């Protein structure tokens, strides 16, 4: 979804992207390579340390690393918010406030690119995670221009072993000339 967002938005020069749950920074580095200024957020210091070591010197002035839960992060206005397989790891009790903050951070014309997990995912019983059904996804995206929305189910692997994946790949744009209330 990140590549699709970058293709739609073009070069990032002078614009802000947020990478929520950036991990070791592979996607963050791709954004830097495309000229974006990036706020990279992750709760794991080890991942941020790996990212820090990989930042090209020429890009160092365009990146800010934040070691925090993205549910606790204060998100600045952004032209692109990327959340690659990270938002489901927000506890369901905190997800509504996080999603509201994401919506508020999207400037007019900005794109959200990311994934959410569906209710048939094998991890759906985990109380520390968030899962949505199709109607909830529709409600979350209300007011955004949905550019792509793909629901998929497959059996595969996760870090913990075999897993049934139920995912929603989302690419959605804040309408031009429309700021989310409170923005």
Predicted regions mapped to residue ranges:
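Class I (Rossmann-like) S-adenosyl-L-methionine-dependent methyltransferase catalytic domain
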Residues: 1-12, 23-74, 94-97, 111-183
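Conserved beta-strand/loop positions that form the S-adenosyl-L-methionine
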Residues: 20
């Amino acid at each position: 979804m990140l590549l699709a967002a970058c293709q739609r938005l073009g070069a990032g020069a002078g614009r802000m992207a947020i990478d929520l749950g950036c991990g070791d920074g592979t996607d963050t580095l791709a954004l830097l390579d495309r000229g974006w200024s990036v706020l990279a957020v992750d709760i794991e210091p080890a991942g941020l340390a790996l990212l820090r070591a990989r930042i090209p010197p020429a890009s160092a002035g365009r990146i800010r690393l934040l070691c925090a839960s993205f549910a606790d992060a204060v998100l600045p206005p952004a032209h692109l918010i990327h959340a690659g397989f990270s938002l489901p790891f927000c506890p369901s009790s905190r997800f509504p406030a996080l999603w509201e903050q994401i919506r508020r951070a999207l400037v007019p014309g900005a794109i959200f690119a990311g994934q959410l997990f569906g209710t048939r995912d094998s991890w759906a019983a985990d109380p520390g995670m968030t899962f949505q059904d199709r109607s909830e996804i529709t409600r979350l995206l209300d007011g955004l221009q949905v550019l792509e929305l793909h629901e998929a189910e497959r059996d595969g692997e996760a870090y913990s072993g075999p897993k049934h994946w139920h995912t929603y790949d989302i690419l959605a744009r804040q309408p031009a000339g429309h700021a989310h209330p409170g923005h």
